Every structure is written in C-alpha cells, then in structure tokens.
C-alpha cells in the first residue's frame, strides 16, 4: 500500500486506520517554538461515520486507502440489498443497509449516485444533492397556526419524514436537500 508523509496530508484524503477506510475532515500543522512539529487531524470512518481526532509527529506516515468514488445509477431494492449499475460498463454491484449510509430514504429508482468502493465492495452511497419526492401523508395546514415555526411533518413516498411549510399538501411533489434532509421547494 502507498503511504504519505504528514506534510502531504490534506482534507478530503482517504486513509486506512486500523484496516478501516476513513476520510480526513480537518488538518492542522503545528510547529511549536520548542520541540518537534506535529500534525493534528480529524477523520471520519466511512463505514460507521464515527469521528476521531489524532495527533501525529511530522515524521510519521499514513496509509492511503484504496477507495474509489464511482458514478452509478440506483436501480432497485429487493428489501435486503440495494442494486446499483455503472452507466458506462453496465456492471452491477449491490450493498446492504450498512453500506447505504442513510441514503436509502432518499432513493426511489433511477437516481445517479456516487458510490464509494473499497476493494470492489460498496461501503458508502452519496445520493444526489436534491431529489424530487411525492408527499404521501401530511396534516392539512391550518391558517394562522404559525406559533411553532410554521411547519408540519410530511411523510414522503420513500418513507422519509421532513418538515414542510403549511401550504404544502398531500400528493404534491417537493424538492428535498439530501445533505440536510430539509424541504427546498415545491415542484410545479
């Protein structure tokens, strides 16, 4: 495996920590007036989402993870596995709920996603930034009922629940930001 020195470590780089892939979220190079320089970094394990902070000497090395981000199209779910296809090679891969990373609540079929593969196996799925989904259940908005912030919960066709404005009704299609899980707009 390839290794890089602490001087070459950057945010967004994918590394191996205890044989598990992680992505670096923050790095800070510190050169104290007295003593040896060191790098303080935060990284998030891709599979579990756990965030860890670590301090390493400037002379230490980290192992680069052999992970690949691939554009793939979500096809379907058979209840236990979610199936994806590479639109160029038509190669198909499947992942379980752990590999979905919470993206399953935003996907209904035929969406383009970024799938992170580690040793050929999907370990993380990043859905599109915005998805258009139909509201299957929500309470009718009562005029003047804005004391609680002017929102109400709505269940979408995939089972996800988001807060929507009072003017949005059942059977309407809305645009949702998958990064925050918030309502973005009503689709006409």
Curated annotation (Swiss-Prot):
Pathway: Protein biosynthesis; polypeptide chain elongation. GO terms for molecular function: translation elongation factor activity. Gene3D superfamilies: 2.30.30.30, Nucleic acid-binding proteins. One of its GO terms (cellular component) is cytoplasm. The modification N6-(3,6-diaminohexanoyl)-5-hydroxylysine is found at residue 34. The keyword Aminoacyl-tRNA synthetase does not apply. Its main location: cytoplasm. It holds the Pfam family EFP. May be beta-lysylated on the epsilon-amino group of Lys-34 by the combined action of EpmA and EpmB, and then hydroxylated on the C5 position of the same residue by EpmC (if this protein is present). Lysylation is critical for the stimulatory effect of EF-P on peptide-bond formation. The lysylation moiety may extend toward the peptidyltransferase center and stabilize the terminal 3-CCA end of the tRNA. Hydroxylation of the C5 position on Lys-34 may allow additional potential stabilizing hydrogen-bond interactions with the P-tRNA. It is found in: Cytoplasm. InterPro entries: Elong-fact-P_C, NA-bd_OB-fold, Rib_uL2_dom2, Transl_elong_fac_P/YeiP, Transl_elong_KOW-like, Transl_elong_P/YeiP_cen, Transl_elong_P/YeiP_CS, Transl_elongation_fac_P. One of its GO terms (biological process) is peptide biosynthetic process. Keywords: Cytoplasm, Elongation factor, Hydroxylation, Protein biosynthesis. Involved in peptide bond synthesis. Alleviates ribosome stalling that occurs when 3 or more consecutive Pro residues or the sequence PPG is present in a protein, possibly by augmenting the peptidyl transferase activity of the ribosome. Modification of Lys-34 is required for alleviation. Belongs to the elongation factor P family. This is Elongation factor P. It comes from Xanthomonas euvesicatoria pv. vesicatoria (strain 85-10).
């Amino acid at each position: 495996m390839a290794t890089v020195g602490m001087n070459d470590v950057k945010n967004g780089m994918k590394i191996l920590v205890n044989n598990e892939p992680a992505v670096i979220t923050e790095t800070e190079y510190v050169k104290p007036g007295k003593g040896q320089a060191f790098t303080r970094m935060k990284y998030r394990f891709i599979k579990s989402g756990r965030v860890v902070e670590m301090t390493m000497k400037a002379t230490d090395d980290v192992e680069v993870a052999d992970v690949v981000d691939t554009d793939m199209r979500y096809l379907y779910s058979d209840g236990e596995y979610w199936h994806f296809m590479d639109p160029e090679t038509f190669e198909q891969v499947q992942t379980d709920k752990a590999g979905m990373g919470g993206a399953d609540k935003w996907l209904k079929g035929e969406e383009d996603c970024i799938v992170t593969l580690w040793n050929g196996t999907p370990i993380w799925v990043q859905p599109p930034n915005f998805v258009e989904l139909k509201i299957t259940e929500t309470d009718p908005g009562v005029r003047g009922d804005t004391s609680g912030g002017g929102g109400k919960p709505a269940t979408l066709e995939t089972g996800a629940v988001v807060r929507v404005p009072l003017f949005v009704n059942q059977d309407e299609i809305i645009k949702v930001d998958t990064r925050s899980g918030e309502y973005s707009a009503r689709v006409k």
